[in-house]
Regions:
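A polyanion-binding, active-site-adjacent surface
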Residues: 2-147, 151-164, 183-188
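Short, flexible loop segments at boundaries between secondary-structure elements
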Residues: 166-189
Length: 189
């Protein structure tokens, strides 16, 4: 099975298995944000043969998706005007010399959390998402490096692979590890 078909199968799994207490991406604006990726962020970063893979924590909240439909999010899968997205794109260019489109980017938690963007997602839910979606995406894409944006993302991936979980980013950043042929790194978000 090709990488594209394997990733599409994971997207289909995500669509069919929305956990209790969360919403699916298709539940907003008549499905305008839905896609055939695990995360809509991949719309702009879906290089299946990427050397660099990015894993962000979560894609959206109920509050943010309940606002009027955003054409940028529909087409790109993210808001280019947000400072975190501008910073990420600049850092990719500065440190790797690549645009976002040369990466494979996804979210650890591919469902819509209730509340606002700072609403808490329990660790057990992040772990379930890592096992069912993030780790399989890493295995399919098989990049040289995965950059986990944020300590919770890095620690969830680490724990799901039975690796130590650092207490803070200062400890996490130098403590990358190898999973199969891929190095997993932590970085601040």
């Amino acid at each position: 099975m090709t990488k594209g078909k394997q990733l599409a199968k994971l997207a289909k799994k995500r669509k069919k298995n929305v956990p209790h207490g969360y919403k699916g991406i298709a539940e907003y604006h008549e499905g305008a944000y839905e896609c055939n990726y695990v995360s809509p962020y991949s719309k702009s970063a879906h290089n299946e043969n990427a050397d660099v893979m990015l894993i962000l924590q979560d894609w959206a909240s109920d509050e943010s998706l309940s606002r009027p439909k955003d054409p940028n999010i529909v087409s790109l899968g993210y808001s280019p005007e947000l400072p975190t997205n501008k910073n990420l794109i600049a850092l990719l260019d500065t440190h790797f010399g690549i645009p976002l489109s040369d990466t494979y980017a996804t979210n650890l938690f591919p469902f819509v959390k209730l509340g606002n963007m700072s609403s808490y997602i329990p660790s057990r839910d992040l772990m379930e998402a890592a096992i069912n979606f993030a780790i399989p995406q890493i295995e399919v894409v098989s990049p040289k490096i995965v950059i986990c944006l944020g300590l919770r993302v890095f620690n969830t991936i680490s724990k799901s692979l039975e690796k130590p979980t650092p207490k803070n980013l200062v400890e996490a950043i130098p403590n990358h590890f190898k999973y199969k042929d891929t190095f997993i790194w932590a970085q601040s978000h």
